[in-house]
């Protein structure tokens, strides 16, 4: 059984393996309903485009006061800071102000003239409080989508689904006793899919500039920013990461694309592998 809904700025497809002895349509539909609900909650909590999201509150007020946040938001921020440290700053989701100035993100609070800090300025206070010692503009789009996929899989399992997959616009996780053929978009022709093998019990995420550089918007800046020099990164090729958890696969694609290093030291820490499709 396969169902699809528009979420996370893309289409989220949930697939349940119908060959399991425990499979029933009622159980599958209920599990899928629950999985879509948790994915929608991630979007509600961490969406940059929503001025009422918890993330928008962090961006607006964390430098003024300590804020209590949802445990999932805290978990994603904790993972983001861990990757920031292990990648020596190459992953930094605090580049939101740069993306606002480029017109790639909405300007909710007229922040274009404010000097913002980086992820090192964000302070996490267990169990679930955050503050920042400088104004900050976090964009969790490069990690929260993968987290949402992981939560979807976790929810399917908790509701009796033994095998299946969750795919959020190319952020894919497969679980159970099935394998799924993997295809990556051609960096020169996004309508062409390039097969790269089969995935079993794991995740893959990819990044490329094939959409931001379509014929209609050739003048648009890249949405990938190098945090070390705050320049928009222009690159050819498609960059994919395989990892056990989709949250880490999602985030590490940015490290790969910026570093151009398929053996970056932080990949081993997250049991991740890198694949590049050249233009």
Please identify what each model-predicted range represents.
Residues 1-279:
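Mature catalytic core of soluble alpha/beta enzymes
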């Amino acid at each position: 059984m396969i169902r699809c809904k528009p979420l996370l700025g893309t289409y989220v497809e949930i697939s349940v393996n119908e060959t399991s002895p425990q499979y029933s349509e009622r159980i599958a539909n209920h599990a899928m309903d629950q999985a879509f609900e948790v994915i929608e909650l991630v979007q509600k909590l961490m969406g940059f485009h929503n001025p009422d999201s918890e993330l928008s509150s962090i961006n607006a007020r964390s430098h003024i006061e300590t804020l209590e946040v949802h445990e999932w938001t805290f978990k994603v921020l904790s993972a983001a800071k861990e990757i920031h440290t292990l990648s020596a700053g190459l992953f930094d989701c605090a580049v939101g102000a740069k993306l606002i100035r480029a017109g790639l993100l909405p300007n909710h609070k007229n922040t274009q003239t404010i000097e913002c800090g980086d992820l090192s300025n964000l302070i996490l206070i267990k169990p679930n409080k955050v503050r920042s010692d400088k104004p900050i503009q976090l964009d969790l789009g490069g990690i929260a989508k993968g987290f949402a996929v992981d939560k979807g899989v976790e929810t399917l399992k908790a509701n009796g689904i033994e095998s299946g997959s969750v795919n959020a616009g190319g952020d894919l996780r497969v679980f159970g006793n099935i394998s799924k053929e993997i295809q990556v978009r051609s960096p020169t022709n996004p309508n062409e899919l390039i097969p790269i093998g089969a995935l079993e019990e794991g995740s893959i995420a990819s990044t490329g500039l094939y959409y931001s550089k379509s014929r209609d918007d050739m003048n648009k800046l890249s949405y990938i920013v190098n945090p070390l020099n705050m320049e928009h990164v222009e690159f050819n090729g498609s960059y994919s990461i395989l990892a056990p958890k989709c949250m880490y696969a999602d985030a590490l694609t940015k490290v790969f694309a910026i570093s151009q290093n398929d053996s970056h030291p932080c990949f081993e820490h997250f049991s991740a592998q890198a694949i590049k499709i050249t233009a």
